């Protein structure tokens, strides 16, 4: 991976090229309305320390806000139709192995929260169901359910998938569509007024940016 960018400015500079950064690059270049130039700056080109390399790529539909449920509904649909989204017959099918998350309520207040959340999740298409203690015991007899009032469980589109392959294809497709990846580190961000306008690289260059996407992860000092 080259450490030096080919241009002095880009429409979008993405700091971090792992799952989030490469996803942003993929979706940008998939949008026909976007014709800009994209630079991805990655300091760990082997992704040895990236969170992407250490995740088990789990997904769930049980959230307390509609926007999170909708994001996860789309996430599951994307995994199920991965080959179509890649627009490439060489892309593999990605399996979503569902096992479901089980949330247990031991107070009337939290039981009501689970019921309200399940109703909202069902309305948005999730298969969440409220289980009684007897129903939970019948399915998972190893639980100590003393004091448990109910549980919330979704057996559909809650589990894990092959995130590593998705990441590889995000990056592959972004590069094929002209996204430039470099091995470097962003050490500073230039601000002018209320917006950012450039990044400074460890190698000394200052690169102009119309927009900056910070996907640098939890180890970043930005």
Q: Where do the model's predicted regions map?
A:
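Beta1/beta-strand and adjacent pyrophosphate-binding region of the FAD-binding site
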Residues: 4-20, 39
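Conserved Rossmann-like nucleotide-cofactor binding loop
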Residues: 20, 46, 219
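Gly/Ala-rich phosphate-binding loop of Rossmann-like dinucleotide-binding domains
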Residues: 25, 29-30, 173
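Glycine-rich FAD pyrophosphate-binding loop
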Residues: 29-52
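Active-site loop/turn elements of alpha/beta-hydrolase fold enzymes
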Residues: 43, 133, 186
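Dinucleotide-binding Rossmann-like beta1-alpha1 core, especially the glycine-rich loop
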Residues: 56-139
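A short, glycine/Asx- and small/polar-enriched loop/turn
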Residues: 109, 140-148, 190-197, 207
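Helical element adjacent to the flavin cofactor pocket in flavoenzyme catalytic cores
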Residues: 153-211, 215-219
């Amino acid at each position: 991976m080259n450490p030096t960018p080919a241009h002095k400015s880009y429409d979008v500079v993405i700091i971090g090229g792992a799952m989030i950064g490469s996803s942003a690059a993929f979706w940008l270049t998939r949008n026909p309305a976007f014709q800009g130039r994209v630079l991805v700056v990655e300091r760990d080109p082997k992704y040895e320390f990236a969170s992407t390399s250490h995740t088990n790529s789990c997904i769930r539909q049980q959230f307390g806000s509609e926007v999170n449920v909708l994001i996860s509904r789309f996430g599951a649909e994307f995994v199920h139709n991965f080959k179509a989204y890649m627009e490439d017959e060489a892309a593999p099918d990605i399996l979503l192995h569902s096992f479901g998350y089980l949330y247990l309520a031991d107070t009337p207040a939290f039981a009501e929260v689970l019921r309200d959340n399940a109703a909202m999740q069902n309305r948005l298409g999730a298969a969440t169901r409220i289980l009684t203690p007897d129903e939970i015991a019948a399915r998972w007899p190893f639980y100590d359910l003393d004091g448990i009032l109910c549980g919330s469980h979704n057996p559909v589109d809650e589990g894990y998938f092959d995130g590593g392959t998705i990441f590889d294809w995000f990056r592959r497709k972004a590069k094929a569509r002209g996204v430039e990846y470099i091995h470097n580190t962003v050490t500073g961000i230039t601000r002018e007024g209320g917006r950012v306008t450039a990044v400074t690289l460890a190698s000394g260059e200052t690169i102009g940016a119309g927009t900056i996407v910070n996907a640098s992860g939890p180890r970043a000092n930005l």
